[in-house]
Design a protein with these regions (language model features):
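Beta-alpha-beta core module
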Residues: 123-129, 134, 195-247
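A bilobed periplasmic-binding-protein/Venus flytrap-type ligand-binding module shared by bacterial periplasmic
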Residues: 139-147, 240-251
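Hydrophobic hinge/microswitch elements
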Residues: 98-101, 167-224
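A short LG(V/I)-centered, amphipathic sequence patch enriched
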Residues: 3-22
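Secondary-structure junction motif
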Residues: 65-69, 110, 114, 150, ...
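Alpha-helical linker/hinge and terminal dimerization helices associated
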Residues: 7-8, 29-51, 55-56
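N-terminal winged-helix
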Residues: 52-95, 253
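Flexible hinge/capping segments at coil-to-helix
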Residues: 120-162
Length: 270
């Protein structure tokens, strides 16, 4: 300590036969020394200590993906991994996986958007792997006037707001998260998250058109999916839900576990 005092030119401690106390210069010195040490610890953590494996999923707004993610996280040591799940816009799902921000992306193809999405997959060197194919369902809250119907037609829906997820600058129907997005609806309301969407269903008797694969454990039991009834002017369409990953890559153990959990849940819903 005396050598350090000589080197920096200040007295850090007052020394007496009763012990030592900090001088004013000493307190100032320790203040800066503590900051330097904390910076050193940050650098050590970033560059010297073993790094955690980061596992990320980007997805359109599907509650079953969150369910599979939860079950996956429960199976691994949280001290060895950092996790991220991003419910986001369609184009961001693609970009996140292409830029390796996420390991897997979950979205759907249909007859309407297949050509556009396949082109984007090719441009970004991504592969699409189908998981499940399903027809359109009307998703609404249990207090909705149409909730007790065995099926619902487009004519019946016209009296209520159609809810969809905001896609930002990519507002084309090719990037919509809802099936039958190419149709014209008298009333349209856009939202950015599932919680707001559910609130609008209750507050405005809104509806959305989806796969019908709903996780009640996460969304609650106040909502239900009713089959969409097509007619000659308003045909039904198939949703092909799947995942994307970079070409010529393999998922590690945690990625495979996530896929297994997702497939298991989708299998139960069938």
């Amino acid at each position: 300590i005396q050598e350090l005092e000589q080197e920096v030119g200040v007295t850090i401690f007052n020394r007496t036969n009763r012990g030592v106390t900090l001088t004013n210069d000493g307190r100032r010195f320790l203040h800066y020394a503590r900051q330097v040490y904390q910076q050193y610890e940050l650098m050590e953590q970033e560059y010297l200590r073993p790094k955690k494996r980061i596992f990320g999923v980007s997805t359109q707004h599907y509650s079953f993906v969150t369910k599979a993610f939860v079950e996956t996280v429960r199976q691994f040591d949280a001290t060895r991994f950092e996790y991220a799940i991003r419910e986001t816009r369609t184009i961001d799902v693609i970009h996140d996986v292409a830029q390796r921000r996420s390991d897997i992306g979950i979205l759907f193809r249909s007859r309407h958007n297949r050509t556009v999405l396949n082109k984007l997959f090719a441009e970004n060197r991504l592969e699409f792997h189908p998981l499940v194919e399903c027809s359109a369902y009307v998703y609404l809250w249990r207090g909705h006037p149409l909730a007790k119907n065995e099926s619902i037609t487009m004519d019946e829906l016209c009296a209520y707001p159609c809810l969809c997820f905001e896609q930002g600058d990519q507002s084309s129907s090719y990037f919509a998260e809802e099936i039958l997005s190419e149709r014209e609806y008298p009333q349209m309301i856009r939202a950015t998250d599932r919680a707001t969407m559910l609130n609008l269903m209750v507050g405005l008797n809104g509806f959305t058109l989806c796969s019908g694969i709903i996780c009640e454990e996460l969304n609650g039991t106040d909502y239900l999916a009713v089959p969409y009834q097509e007619d000659k002017d308003n045909q039904n369409a198939k949703m092909e839900i799947g995942y994307i990953q970079p070409k010529n890559t393999e998922l590690d153990e945690i990625g495979e576990t996530f896929l297994r959990e997702m497939k298991a849940y989708l299998g139960q819903q069938k």
